[in-house]
Amino acid sequence: MFDRYDAGEQAVLVHIYFTQDKDMEDLQEFESLVSSAGVEALQVITGSRKAPHPKYFVGEGKAVEIAEAVKATGASVVLFDHALSPAQERNLERLCECRVIDRTGLILDIFAQRARTHEGKLQVELAQLRHLATRLVRGWTHLERQKGGIGLRGPGETQLETDRRLLRNRIVQIQSRLERVEKQREQGRQSRIKADVPTVSLVGYTNAGKSTLFNRITEARVYAADQLFATLDPTLRRIDVADVGETVLADTVGFIRHLPHDLVAAFKATLQETRQATLLLHVIDAADVRVQENIEAVNTVLEEIDAHEIPTLLVMNKIDMLEDFEPRIDRDEENKPNRVWLSAQTGAGIPQLFQALTERLSGEVAQHTLRLPPQEGRLRSRFYQLQAIEKEWMEEDGSVSLQVRMPIVDWRRLCKQEPALIDYLI
């Protein structure tokens, strides 16, 4: 088994088309991924197939072509824009006599370079270890010269078992740490939910401009760059929205086509901010030729994390890269804002975004069940004045239980006026 490649290395890239329609944007995105990893592409090899070859993924002739390209260019790694099976990866490494990294391994490497917080690093390591676990097989080149003997009935067998055990132990250890992080996040979320502080979560295809928009809105100076996966760690900031008040804005990891499942699983804690959001701001690069495909790719991941039914406002970003395009709000048949056109880079359209946020969030409804002690008759009267009581019943201890429904703005105003209200929630 070969070590992970280092940034600054030189590679041969392999991209295979499985349809008659050769989509050049797929290849361009792959080249962007490679560039984001800090790897120099010496040669790009393309080809067409109806289905992957079981031994090499590509045909045997193409596999030989790749091996010859490695020798001719002096490349130290071959990068595939596809998911390879452990056996395919191993067969190609033997043929090419260098490391072979598939799309999943490449994305994981970029994530490893980008992670900045302790939590982010743990999440990346977990995904890497899960990926590596499928590739721990009897093929370790540094052990093949060992001779069999007592306790060593095969090349490297004992070492292999030890590594598997260490890998399993480390995975369990990281999962335990991430569960603790998730519990802490959940406590913060629950306190926001009780006070009905809305959470607006930015989602979108990688490099759509989410972090630039986040910075424009909050002036938080989150790391933003024109590269894939510039943001990994979730960042939360409080903002003030007219007629709504305090709102939490969350910036999260960008999505991409064919996002490895291990990655989605490892970033569960980060993506939880998206799953629990009041409103999603789906940021879209309006200047990208694959707008619709990028939207569908994001929707696929949202479905995978059970966030596809959360109310969404589309944000068409980068209008400064379109000709004669002015900021505007598009509305649906109910006259609700459903799309805002803006430029996070120049700030054009930010007032329209805040207007849309006000309209969408102030229209949200708070639903709660409370148990009021006998002495809180005045509070009960307030709910009647607001025409918020849907159901009311007496408890054996003399307290009154209420099921209330009211505009979220009214609920938050009442919480500020009556701080004890939170204690009566059940």
Curated annotation (Swiss-Prot):
Residues 198-365 form the Hflx-type G domain. GTP binds at residues 204-211, 229-233, 251-254, 317-320, 343-345. Intrinsic GTPase activity is very slow and can be stimulated by the presence of 50S ribosomal subunits or 70S ribosomes. GTPase activity is inhibited by ATP. GO terms for cellular component: cytoplasm; cytosol. Keywords: ATP-binding, Cytoplasm, GTP-binding, Magnesium, Metal-binding, Nucleotide-binding. The keyword Transport does not apply. PROSITE patterns: G_HFLX. Mg(2+) binds at residues 211, 231. GO terms for molecular function: ATP binding; ATP hydrolysis activity; GTP binding; GTPase activity; guanosine tetraphosphate binding; metal ion binding; ribosomal large subunit binding; ribosome binding. Its cofactor is Mg(2+). Disruption phenotype: Disruption does not affect lambda lysogeny or the transposition frequency of transposable elements. Gene3D superfamilies: 6.10.250.2860, GTPase HflX, N-terminal domain, P-loop containing nucleotide triphosphate hydrolases. InterPro entries: EFG_III/V, G_HFLX_dom, GTP-bd, GTP-bd_M, GTPase_HflX, GTPase_HflX_N, GTPase_HflX_N_sf, HflX_C. Its main location: cytoplasm. Signal peptide: none annotated. One of its GO terms (biological process) is response to heat. It is found in: Cytoplasm. NCBIfam families: GTP_HflX (TIGR03156), PRK11058.1 (NF008280). HAMAP family: GTPase_HflX. Belongs to the TRAFAC class OBG-HflX-like GTPase superfamily. HflX GTPase family. Full-length protein is required for specific association with the 50S ribosomal subunit. Monomer. Associates with the 50S ribosomal subunit. This interaction occurs in the presence of GTP, GDP, ATP or ADP, but not in their absence. GTPase that associates with the 50S ribosomal subunit and may have a role during protein synthesis or ribosome biogenesis. In vitro, also exhibits ATPase activity. This is GTPase HflX. The gene is hflX.
